[in-house]
Amino acid sequence: PAYTYTASCSVIEHVGATPVMVDIQEDHFEMNYDALAEAITEKTKVVIPVELAGVPCDYRRIFEVVESKRGLFQPSTNLQRYFNRIIVVSDCAHAIGTTRDGVSVAKLADFASYSFHAVKNLTTAEGGCITWNPENELDSEAMYKEFQVYSLHGQTKDALAKIKPGSWEYDIVIPGFKCNMPDIMAAIGLAQLERYPQLLE
């Protein structure tokens, strides 16, 4: 949507794609689903709905639009070929714990990204996480390894694995980013996650 944070657009720019904005509804924070349908072309690979202020999008409508445009879809990666349709990635930076019709928004999209920034109600000061919908039957171990490599400058081993005797060698397989979460921040996040239901109340 046009009313969003820069992160939703930056990730598109990082992969060399062109972001196309879809505005919100006149009287609501949800995206305009008719405008979404009009914006989709044969170049569209991903739709990134934003759960602005914790207001969940209507994923039934989003997937209806995606399904109606299936004939336009032209996959260019293995993941895109696996889905064989536009992938839906929810920006859940404001939506930890948000549900729609009793279902977590993370389970409504194909993937969901979360922010644990200092201003969020579950924080590790910085950082975030990505989840994927188990109903899509992705290879979770392979997905985890792929995200791990991306977050470690493209290295095939993390710092702990490299310090074990005889394990200092590693490969750099892609031009990744340095965005792995330190253990201390992760521990803070896990402790907050345990008490998160109380925080929501």
Task: Write out the residue ranges for each language-model feature.
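PLP-dependent aminotransferase-like
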Residues: P1-C92, T99
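Hydrophobic/aromatic ligand-binding patch that stacks against planar heteroaromatic rings
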Residues: S10-I12, S104, I184
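Residue-level signal for well-ordered, solvent-exposed loop/turn and beta-edge residues enriched
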Residues: H28-E30, V103, C129
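Short, hinge-like loop/turn segments at secondary-structure boundaries
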Residues: A37-A39, V65-V66, V105-K107, I130-W132
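Active-site region of PLP-dependent enzymes
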Residues: S76-R81, H94-D101, L108-E201
